[in-house]
Amino acid sequence: MHFNRILNPSLRKCASQHIPTRVYGNMHNSNKLYVMKQSNYMAFLQEAKQFIPQERIYTDELRRLAWGTDAGFYRLIPQIVIRSEGEEEISRLLKLAGSHNLPVTFRAAGTSLSGQAISDSILIVAGKHWEGYSISPDHEEITLQPGIIGQRVNELLAPFGRKFAPDPASVKSAMVGGIVMNNASGMNCGTHANSDKVLLSARIVLADGTVLDTGDAVSRAAFEVTHRDFLRRICTLRDEVRADEKLSERIHYKYSIKNVTGLNLLPFIRFDDPFDIIAHLMVGSEGTLAFLSQVTMKTEYDYPCKASAMLYFKTIKDACRAVVAMKKLTDNNGGWIVKGAELLDWKSLASVSDPIFLKYRGEICSSPLPGIEPGDETGLTAVLTETKARTDEELKRNIGAIEHCLSHFRTYTPVRFTDKPEEYSQYWAIRSGIFPSVGGTRKPGTTCLIEDVAFHIEDLPEATAELQQLIARHGYEDACIYGHALEGNYHFILNQSFGSDAEVKRYEELMNDVKTLVVDKYDGSLKAEHGTGRNMAPFVRYEWGDSAYEVMKAVKKLFDPQGLLNPGVIFNDDPKCHIKNFKPLPLIPLDAKSPAAKVNRCIECGFCEVNCLSCGFTLSSRQRIVLQREIARLRQNGDAPERLALLEKQYLYPGNRTCAGDGLCSMSCPMGINTGDLTHIIRQEELPQGSLGYKAGNFAANHFAGIKSALRPILGLADLGHSILGTKAMSSITKGMHNALGIPLWTPAMPKPYKFKPKELKAGNKVVYFPSCINQTMGLPKKSPVEQPLVNKMIALLQKGGYEVIFPKNMEKLCCGTIWESKGMLDIANRKTAELEAALWEASEEGKYPVLCDQSPCLHRMRSTIQKMKLYEPAEFIYTFLRDKLSFTPIDRPIAVHITCSMRKMGLADTIIALAQLCSTKGIVP
């Protein structure tokens, strides 16, 4: 029964401001909805709202759909979403859910790929407010809450020469809870430094609400009293596993390579202490056993010296044989010399237009190479190889050993290692560009799937070639294979449509053949990194066998006797669950020439959310695209007008009004999608020509100088009132006026008026300076620690550096257009930009002189629309042109550097940090 059809009116009002009262169309694709009584839901919400504020409980259509989306290709819509903020809340929620027999799913960042972070019941989010950490005095251990992002952990450890050992490709977006609970790994950590191997202790909340800290003696002692039978059963399972010699050997063998299929059985072999077993059972459990509220993990040494080489082989088998050989190389301490070996097949190379691949393609077409069929480009394979060391001398020895090893293989190009970051970063750019290139060029409406398997290293040459042939046999012409060859772990990208039964059948047949190849022939892993989820749940028993699977089921029954924790994940009785509940990806109708059209490339991975300013406040950039896709689908189908109207209404504030529109989300999006462009289009539709808002915007554009002049006396009046009344009285009066009349809220930091009077002094070098509208109009606030407005300081600095400052004509009327762009009045914005461009073109003598703008958001728009002049931001101009002309005396006080969104988008973060380091011995980025 759908939740919103059973709430009575009074409970609807308590649960949410926007509660839909009907189910529309085909919104919920859930294969298995749990039929629950009306009283269960009512009782759950009535009790939950006693300790969870209403604003953190979502039951409206909009936010349930938004929060019900993860990075995978399945969709379930939760009936209730709760954003948790503490362990006590989790404990009470789990006890409450258990008492009403309601299933619960946990979610952190939602970057998982196999359907393990979605729910059709209760979704508990543990992201924001779960970001605590502590580092041990020797920096070799770190304690983390589940909501802290992996990259943030690396930033915390970097000053100590340490790093977070698990290194999934999603580390810049994924949170620790998801990384540990999925045993997510990447290129370097392999099986020796994944979460299971570096975990020291865990703090968990069990299904009955009990909190256990396996690293705390008091907590352990209390648990021994309250859960004696639980511990006894853990010990019994341990002993039974060890007594089964065949099963023990199988567990050792399966975990000698990456494997996250099913529950983690390795703890029963590795540990005697039941508390250690409990802690490590959490790794890879995907929220099916307990809630993970804290982990303590070993940190890893971060090697300072690194070198990489891109190796090219004429066949994929030769490439794999070379990897097998390099895997055997060890240093004097027994450590592996090769730290990473990333294989890229020919389609991967073609997708990013790799220059060596293009050269190879040309050669085999014009003059075939020995042993290669004319025109056959399908063999070329690259292996991006990396080695690391503590010293330069050790690094040179490593390179020598690898080169000697490779001398026994025929490479297409000479082996060349580089230890220069500016060179090897280009290699890694090729590697990181594969996914966005393949996913971004997929056919409209198709889903980008990333499958994930692993083979034992000795099987690599044959297994890789067969996998390549298998994918081609099923007609996936644009699919490519790449991944962590050193660990036998490959990803293959499929651009898959689920729009017809035939396409679903094709995917099903592919996965059946993959299962046969990986399990039956090579006894590998069907999931090496991405979690079992729903995607591989039907195949867990098939891969592991009956004995191991029965142990997993016993563990599940022990931890979750009611079966309420993430049901359907890892354990699923439906053999077809992996081909049900596919996520629709309808097209948003946008002009193909519009920058906003890129949103249709979105794969909903969530990588954008770390940079989204409204994420955690209202909606994230990913969620906006999800919702606009659903709105577009409803508009196209026309079968649910009431639901469409509801979503459009609910979207207005969280989706539209609170989007910053600055495009910072595009910096972490693998496709480079700027969701702000979509927001601008939506706002444009809201303000058509002829509307009152558009007329007001057009009037402002046509009378810009007058509006700026009118603003100055208003600022002056506010400053006078502040002087007469004082801060306290002024704040009280203006707050009342704000509440009564809706006038802008006054603060003590309100600036005084500023009237800019340009003065030009002749000098040898020349620069065109366009002060932003804000800096032309607003001065300093009362009691400002700064003596001069920015414009005055900028002019003085330029003149001190020997520059003649030129100002464009009619500067009072000019604007970059950002104001109108942000409101969706794109035609007016472009008109204002054109006016500015013409004035700057004249002032710079047709681009002869550089142009400086002192506001980074303004400059960012100028750079994106004005191409024929060199435009600079102040820190960039100073560092580039004035650094050698001025004398810097660093102060011995900290300088906090705020890097704006626009500066980050323009790639100026390093520049302003470098400039700050010239000015202070302690430049800090908060």
Model regions and ranges:
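Ferredoxin-type iron-sulfur electron-transfer modules in oxidoreductases and energy-metabolism complexes
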Residues: 571-600, 609, 615-719, 828-835, ...
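Iron-sulfur cluster-binding electron-transfer modules in prokaryotic oxidoreductases
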Residues: 560, 590, 676-926
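Flexible inter-domain linker/hinge segments
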Residues: 225-269, 550, 557-610, 616-633, ...
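Terminal amphipathic helices with adjacent charged low-complexity linkers/tails
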Residues: 295, 300-302, 333-444, 479, ...
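N-terminal flexible segment immediately upstream of the FAD-binding catalytic core
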Residues: 31-99, 109-140, 169, 192, ...
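N-terminal glycine-rich flavin-associated loop
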Residues: 48, 72-104, 122-168, 184-236, ...
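A gly/ser-rich beta-alpha-beta helix-loop segment of oxidoreductase catalytic cores
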Residues: 72-73, 113-114, 118, 151, ...
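Flexible, glycine/charged-enriched surface loops at secondary-structure junctions
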Residues: 54-60, 107, 165-167, 241-262, ...
